[in-house]
Structure formats: structure tokens, C-alpha cells
């Protein structure tokens, strides 16, 4: 064990195990998660060579092999709970993506949300055991987030009671679905439904694409892999072209909308119900942001405690780089953000499950806010995490650039989150639509509830300098509750600015669509401010729920740092709205420095509490034992280029040196 890490752990103010229990939800959840992790980590069937040293084709084959073993093991161990399945799936390939991932994250949830009981009975069991391997084919070459622009058609033929699927243009070819290229034999295809001469918009269809037994593409289906990408080497993201391809009427998912045998269309109770899978996956992605950022912080903080460099006091030993204030300023706000997102992710999961249950009972009242919240928080957390992972990599200096650090892989695996399941700017604009509707409701005399209830105060308060001039004296920069109020005022102010600018443009332009585009920068800023407020509010509420004093104390420091750092980075908003004064912003910056010093002794313990095992972390720099340099050398020696002392390519250089 590295003596620096021993010293760090001995000097912590709290027991990391207690904080791990908080993150997992309970001590029992921690015990069970570790039990499942150990089933994999101690199983020789799941051991494999370092994927960094394999070709893309080899990496894909390893991933498929491990996925097949995973299903067999889940049956053997009786793992059926959705949360436990998720834990098991995350570990069997460690830090790499799995080709069958969309079968579990998109295909099965869509079947559950949009399929009838009969359809679930037909396909669900087979898909859980990978007899049917499904993917989710929504995105096309020409359209992604703009769902109404999708061009794939499904035309109903009442004579044969079949749908005829077509990819009428090059841009209508399905493009990007994970597992589509080589792995899947079925796809849930999103297509424009035509029946009785009319288009009824996007609907979901179960489409067999490969023959069971031979795995060959079926007649009328053209399918393949789209080629190498920035990351995701193990994933066969694919394309799908359909030419007059027929499927039975029963293959349309009909829990909500239906097409009768004669072609009569029965519309759903609520059009938003068909977007259930997207809402589910976006709520899940908030937790993924937290997990990826927590990994990056663990690596960067541990390495910063092990690495010694330069000098603070001349003649003294080189200090740990974690002792430099600039390193703390790079990493500790990100560590605080990781904890904030952990709690927001747990909240989103609980909220989705609760509202989904209400929807099942016919109560759709909270669906609009759930849609807006999942869209906005998906964008807010993934944008932040994407930038933060790269900041962690650069905080590790040159070694962070090596794949041995684990950070490049975390980055390239996470960064697609900013564009898949809804491009982030568009997601923010979807949240903005909900905010504008809520603003209009308030101004028509109605009250709004949920996370936007702060807008109810607008008509009486008006976010204007002369009427909130007393506010600065009320801000307590040491009170998470007071800071939450400051974020609330900022959100209200930016929502009102966006709404007023939108109204002005509507009057001038006469077109709501053009006005929306010309106000879109303000609308995105309003959504970001709303999401930032939600994160601060949820973090603050979580801290108050903690009973153990040592845990509450360290989380309170992180909560304060997260809130104050956000104010520092967005000082203009707080100053322009007269929410805070210039002297208070100066105090905020001073308090941030104090918090860096206060968090420093607990930094290693805080990342230990995330409880990532070394195999899960996949990093030489972030090893639990801190023995970085010895293992860095061992890792390098495994490079395939080192299998020979003289590489075969030397023949090209030898002729140039023959005259020397």
C-alpha cells in the first residue's frame, strides 16, 4: 500500500463505508451489490485480456462472448431484480460497452411500456434470454432528435393484415442503433404509420431482421455495421434499410394506439405515452452521468495524492500535487458535482418509477413535468460530466493521456450521451417549452406545482432590481437553504427574461416558430438555470436527511462548495438580478478557498466511498493501493509492439541506414 494513501485514509473525518451505504440507499443494498460484483470479479469465465491491446473485431467478439456468458450466469444465480441486473451487466465487461446493451435498456423497456399483454407474452421471455436479441431503431441518417422528421414508413395493407415497411430515401436509412450491425435479430423500428390513406405519425413496430438459427438478414432487409467511431469499439452500431418488408399487424406495439384489422386507427389516450422509453432512458442517464464522473474523480484524486511534483517551500520534499490549491480548485468542485449528481440520479429513478405507476392508473398529471425534467437534467448533467471528465484527465498531466489511466476510455464511452437519446440543446429547448407554458399559466392566474412552483411568486414579486434590492442582505453563503433560494431567484429571473423576449419577438415577427428560434439562446439559459436550481435543491434536501453527523458534515461542505462554485462561475446572473452584491461575490470566492482546505483531508475518503473496485475502475493511476509507477511499467510492457525487440517494420528504415 502506498504510504501517501495510507496517511490520507487515516486522516479522514468520517468512515467511507457509512457514506457508501448512503449512496447505495442502505447497508443491505451495499452488501447485495458487492455480492453480485464478486460473483463476476471472482469468476474465471469473466476474465479477459486487456481490451486496449485488441483490434476492433477482437474487442467485439470478446464483448459478444461475455454477454452470452452474462445471460447464462444471471439464470444460474437467479438474478431477476432490475437493479441487480443493472449491477451485473455493468461489471461483466468492466468499463466497455456491450453489443446486447440496447436489448435490455431499450428493447425490453419499450415492450413493457408500449406492448399489450399478448405481445409481452410473445416476445418478453425470449428477449430476456437472448433468443431474441433486440435493438431500438429510431435514429436515421438524416434525422435524430427531430422525431417528426423521421422518414421510414409503415403502410397498412388490410387485405393481408400486414404492415409494409420501407426506407424511401437514403436519409431514411436507420443509422446508429447499437447492436444493429451484427448482433441483433429483431429491432423495434420507429416509423410513420399510414393507414386508410392517412399518416398518423410515429409508431413502434417489432421487426425481425435476421433469420433465427442462421442469423442471416431476411429478404427485404439490408443491415450492417456503420464503421469505426470515436469510441464504442465493442459496439456494432448499425444501419438498416427496408424494401417493401412485410410484418404482421400484431407486430405494431398496441398498448396505447391501435390499428384494427380493417385499418381503422384508434388513437392513444395521450400522445406523450408513446415516448415512455425515451423518458425512461433519459432518467437513467442522469445516474450514468454521476457514475462516470465519480470514476473520473476517483482516478484523478487518488493519483493527485500519490503524485509528488515541484516544490512549495524551497529545499523541502516535493509535495503531493493534491496540496496545490490549483489542483484542489480543478478537482474538488467536480467531486462535489459527482455527489450532487449521485443524489439527483437516485431522485430521478424514484420519480420515474412513481409517476410511471401513476400513469398505469390513468393519472397523467405529472407526465409533462417528468418529460421536461428528464430532458433538461439529461442535458445538464451530461454536458457538465463531459467537460469534467476531460478536466480530470488533464489534471493527471501526461499520464492521463495514456489508456492505462482509464480516463480516455471513460471519456469516449460517456461523450455520446450528449447527443444520443436527444441532442442536448434540443433537450434544453424541450424543457424551455414546459417552462414557458408554466410561466403563461401563472400569468393567467393559475398556480403551478412541482419544481416550477417558484414561478407562482412572479406576479407579486417581479424579478426587478428595485423590488429585490433587500435580497442581498438575506443571503447567507454558509447556508445551503439560503443558497438554494438564490438559485431559485436566478432561475425565476432567467425564465421571465426568456418569456418576455419571446413575447416581444412574437409581436415583431408574427410567427411563434421564428420568434422561438430568435429567443432560443435565452430559452436554453433559462432551462440551464432551472436545472441548476433543481440540482442544488435536491442536494440540499439530501444533506438534511442524513442522520450520521460526520457524514452530514462532509456532505454539507460538498453541498456548499457545489452551490458557491456555481455562483462564482455564473456571477453575472446573480449580480445583474441584484440577487447578490459584488462584495458578496468576493466573499463567495473567499469561502470557496476555505472549503477547498476543509475538504482536502477527506478527499481520498470521499472517492473511496464511491466503492469502485480496481477492476471496475480500469485505471493504473487510480489503483486503490496507490502503487502507480510499478504497474505503469508493467502495463506498458504488455503492449503488442513489445512482443519483438525489433519490429518487422524496421525493414523500411534499414535501407536508409545501409550507407551509414
Curated annotation (Swiss-Prot):
<dbReference type="GO" id="GO:0003997">
    <property type="term" value="F:acyl-CoA oxidase activity"/>
</dbReference>
<feature type="modified residue" description="N6-succinyllysine">
    <location>
        <position position="654"/>
    </location>
</feature>
<feature type="modified residue" description="N6-acetyllysine; alternate">
    <location>
        <position position="446"/>
    </location>
</feature>
<dbReference type="InterPro" id="IPR006091">
    <property type="entry name" value="Acyl-CoA_Oxase/DH_mid-dom"/>
</dbReference>
<feature type="modified residue" description="N6-acetyllysine; alternate">
    <location>
        <position position="437"/>
    </location>
</feature>
<feature type="modified residue" description="N6-succinyllysine; alternate">
    <location>
        <position position="512"/>
    </location>
</feature>
<feature type="modified residue" description="N6-acetyllysine">
    <location>
        <position position="500"/>
    </location>
</feature>
<feature type="active site" description="Proton acceptor">
    <location>
        <position position="421"/>
    </location>
</feature>
<keyword id="KW-0597">Phosphoprotein</keyword>
<dbReference type="Pfam" id="PF02770">
    <property type="entry name" value="Acyl-CoA_dh_M"/>
</dbReference>
<feature type="modified residue" description="N6-acetyllysine">
    <location>
        <position position="255"/>
    </location>
</feature>
<feature type="modified residue" description="N6-succinyllysine; alternate">
    <location>
        <position position="437"/>
    </location>
</feature>
<dbReference type="InterPro" id="IPR046373">
    <property type="entry name" value="Acyl-CoA_Oxase/DH_mid-dom_sf"/>
</dbReference>
<dbReference type="GO" id="GO:0033540">
    <property type="term" value="P:fatty acid beta-oxidation using acyl-CoA oxidase"/>
</dbReference>
<keyword id="KW-0560">Oxidoreductase</keyword>
<feature type="modified residue" description="N6-acetyllysine">
    <location>
        <position position="272"/>
    </location>
</feature>
<dbReference type="GO" id="GO:0019395">
    <property type="term" value="P:fatty acid oxidation"/>
</dbReference>
<dbReference type="InterPro" id="IPR012258">
    <property type="entry name" value="Acyl-CoA_oxidase"/>
</dbReference>
<dbReference type="GO" id="GO:0006693">
    <property type="term" value="P:prostaglandin metabolic process"/>
</dbReference>
<feature type="modified residue" description="N6-acetyllysine">
    <location>
        <position position="65"/>
    </location>
</feature>
<dbReference type="GO" id="GO:0050665">
    <property type="term" value="P:hydrogen peroxide biosynthetic process"/>
</dbReference>
<feature type="modified residue" description="N6-acetyllysine; alternate">
    <location>
        <position position="637"/>
    </location>
</feature>
<dbReference type="InterPro" id="IPR009100">
    <property type="entry name" value="AcylCoA_DH/oxidase_NM_dom_sf"/>
</dbReference>
<feature type="modified residue" description="N6-succinyllysine">
    <location>
        <position position="349"/>
    </location>
</feature>
<dbReference type="GO" id="GO:0009062">
    <property type="term" value="P:fatty acid catabolic process"/>
</dbReference>
<feature type="modified residue" description="Phosphoserine">
    <location>
        <position position="26"/>
    </location>
</feature>
<feature type="modified residue" description="N6-succinyllysine">
    <location>
        <position position="89"/>
    </location>
</feature>
<comment type="function">
    <text>Involved in the initial and rate-limiting step of peroxisomal beta-oxidation of straight-chain saturated and unsaturated very-long-chain fatty acids. Catalyzes the desaturation of fatty acyl-CoAs such as palmitoyl-CoA (hexadecanoyl-CoA) to 2-trans-enoyl-CoAs ((2E)-enoyl-CoAs) such as (2E)-hexadecenoyl-CoA, and donates electrons directly to molecular oxygen (O(2)), thereby producing hydrogen peroxide (H(2)O(2)).</text>
</comment>
<dbReference type="InterPro" id="IPR029320">
    <property type="entry name" value="Acyl-CoA_ox_N"/>
</dbReference>
<dbReference type="GO" id="GO:0050660">
    <property type="term" value="F:flavin adenine dinucleotide binding"/>
</dbReference>
<feature type="modified residue" description="Phosphoserine">
    <location>
        <position position="649"/>
    </location>
</feature>
<dbReference type="GO" id="GO:0005777">
    <property type="term" value="C:peroxisome"/>
</dbReference>
<dbReference type="GO" id="GO:0071949">
    <property type="term" value="F:FAD binding"/>
</dbReference>
<feature type="modified residue" description="N6-acetyllysine; alternate">
    <location>
        <position position="512"/>
    </location>
</feature>
<dbReference type="InterPro" id="IPR036250">
    <property type="entry name" value="AcylCo_DH-like_C"/>
</dbReference>
<keyword id="KW-0276">Fatty acid metabolism</keyword>
<comment type="similarity">
    <text>Belongs to the acyl-CoA oxidase family.</text>
</comment>
<feature type="modified residue" description="N6-acetyllysine">
    <location>
        <position position="651"/>
    </location>
</feature>
<dbReference type="GO" id="GO:0005504">
    <property type="term" value="F:fatty acid binding"/>
</dbReference>
<dbReference type="InterPro" id="IPR034171">
    <property type="entry name" value="ACO"/>
</dbReference>
<dbReference type="Pfam" id="PF22924">
    <property type="entry name" value="ACOX_C_alpha1"/>
</dbReference>
<dbReference type="GO" id="GO:0140493">
    <property type="term" value="P:very long-chain fatty acid beta-oxidation"/>
</dbReference>
Amino acid at each position: 500500500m502506498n504510504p501517501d494513501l495510507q496517511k490520507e485514509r487515516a486522516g479522514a473525518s468520517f468512515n467511507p463505508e457509512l457514506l457508501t451505504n448512503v449512496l447505495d440507499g442502505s447497508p443491505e443494498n451495499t452488501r447485495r451489490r458487492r455480492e453480485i460484483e464478486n460473483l463476476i470479479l471472482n469468476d474465471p469465465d469473466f476474465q479477459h485480456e486487456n481490451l486496449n491491446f485488441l483490434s476492433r473485431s477482437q474487442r467485439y467478439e470478446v464483448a459478444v462472448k461475455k454477454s452470452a456468458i452474462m445471460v447464462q450466469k444471471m439464470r444460474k444465480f437467479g438474478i431477476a431484480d432490475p437493479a441487480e441486473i443493472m449491477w451485473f451487466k455493468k461489471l461483466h465487461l468492466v468499463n466497455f460497452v456491450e453489443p446486447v446493451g440496447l436489448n435490455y435498456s431499450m428493447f425490453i423497456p419499450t415492450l413493457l411500456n408500449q406492448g399489450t399483454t399478448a405481445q409481452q407474452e410473445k416476445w418478453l421471455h425470449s428477449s430476456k434470454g437472448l433468443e431474441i436479441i433486440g435493438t431500438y431503431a429510431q435514429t436515421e441518417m438524416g434525422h435524430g432528435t427531430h422525431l417528426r422528421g423521421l422518414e421510414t414508413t409503415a403502410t397498412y395493407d388490410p387485405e393481408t393484415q400486414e404492415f409494409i415497411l420501407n426506407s424511401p430515401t437514403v436519409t431514411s436509412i436507420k443509422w446508429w442503433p447499437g447492436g444493429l450491425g451484427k448482433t441483433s435479430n429483431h429491432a423495434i423500428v420507429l416509423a410513420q404509420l399510414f393507414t386508410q390513406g392517412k399518416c398518423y405519425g410515429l409508431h413502434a413496430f417489432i421487426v425481425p431482421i435476421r433469420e433465427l438459427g442462421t442469423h442471416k438478414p431476411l429478404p427485404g432487409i439490408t443491415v450492417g455495421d456503420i464503421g469505426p467511431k470515436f469510441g464504442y469499439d465493442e459496439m456494432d452500431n448499425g444501419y438498416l434499410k427496408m424494401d417493401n418488408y412485410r410484418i404482421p399487424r400484431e407486430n405494431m406495439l398496441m398498448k396505447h394506439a391501435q390499428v384494427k384489422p380493417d385499418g381503422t386507427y384508434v388513437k392513444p389516450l395521450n400522445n406523450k405515452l408513446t415516448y415512455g422509453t425515451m423518458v425512461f432512458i433519459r432518467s437513467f442517464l442522469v445516474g450514468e452521468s454521476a457514475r462516470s464522473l465519480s470514476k473520473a474523480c476517483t482516478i484523478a484524486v487518488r493519483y493527485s495524492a500519490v503524485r509528488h511534483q515541484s516544490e512549495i517551500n524551497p529545499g523541502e520534499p516535493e509535495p503531493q500535487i493534491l496540496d496545490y490549491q490549483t489542483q484542489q480548485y480543478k478537482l474538488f468542485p467536480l467531486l462535489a458535482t459527482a455527489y450532487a449528481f449521485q443524489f439527483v440520479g437516485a431522485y430521478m429513478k424514484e420519480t420515474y418509477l412513481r409517476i410511471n405507476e401513476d400513469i398505469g392508473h390513468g393519472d397523467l398529471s405529472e407526465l409533462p413535468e417528468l418529460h421536461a425534467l428528464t430532458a433538461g437534467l439529461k442535458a445538464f448533467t451530461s454536458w457538465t460530466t463531459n467537460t469534467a471528465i476531460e478536466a480530470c484527465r488533464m489534471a493527471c498531466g501526461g499520464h492521463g493521456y495514456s489508456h492505462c489511466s482509464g480516463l480516455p476510455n471513460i471519456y469516449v464511452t460517456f461523450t455520446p450521451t450528449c447527443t444520443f437519446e436527444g441532442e442536448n440543446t434540443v433537450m434544453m429547448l424541450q424543457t424551455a417549452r414546459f417552462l414557458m407554458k408554466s410561466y403563461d399559466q401563472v400569468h393567467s392566474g393559475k398556480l403551478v406545482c412541482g419544481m416550477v412552483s417558484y414561478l407562482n411568486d412572479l406576479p407579486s414579486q417581479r424579478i426587478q432590481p428595485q423590488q429585490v434590492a433587500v435580497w442581498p442582505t438575506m443571503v447567507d453563503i454558509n447556508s445551503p437553504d439560503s443558497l438554494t433560494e438564490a438559485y431559485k431567484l436566478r432561475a425565476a429571473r432567467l425564465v421571465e427574461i426568456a418569456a418576455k423576449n419571446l413575447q416581444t419577438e412574437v409581436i415583431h415577427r408574427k410567427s411563434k416558430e421564428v420568434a422561438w428560434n430568435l429567443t432560443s439562446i435565452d430559452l436554453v439559459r433559462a432551462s440551464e438555470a432551472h436545472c441548476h436550481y433543481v440540482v442544488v435543491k435536491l442536494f440540499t434536501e439530501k444533506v438534511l436527511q442524513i442522520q450520521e453527523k460526520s457524514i452530514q458534515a462532509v456532505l454539507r461542505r460538498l453541498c456548499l462548495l457545489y452551490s458557491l462554485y456555481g455562483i462564482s462561475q455564473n456571477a453575472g446572473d446573480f449580480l445583474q438580478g441584484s440577487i447578490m452584491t459584488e462584495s458578496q461575490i468576493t466573499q463567495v470566492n473567499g469561502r470557496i478557498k476555505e472549503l477547498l482546505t476543509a475538504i482536502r483531508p477527506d478527499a481520498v475518503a470521499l472517492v473511496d466511498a464511491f466503492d469502485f473496485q480496481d477492476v471496475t475502475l480500469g485505471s493504473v493511476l487510480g489503483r486503490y493501493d496507490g502503487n502507480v509507477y510499478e504497474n505503469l511499467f508493467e502495463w506498458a510492457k504488455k503492449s503488442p509492439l513489445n512482443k519483438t525487440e525489433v519490429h518487422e517494420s524496421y525493414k523500411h528504415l534499414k535501407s536508409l541506414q545501409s550507407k551509414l
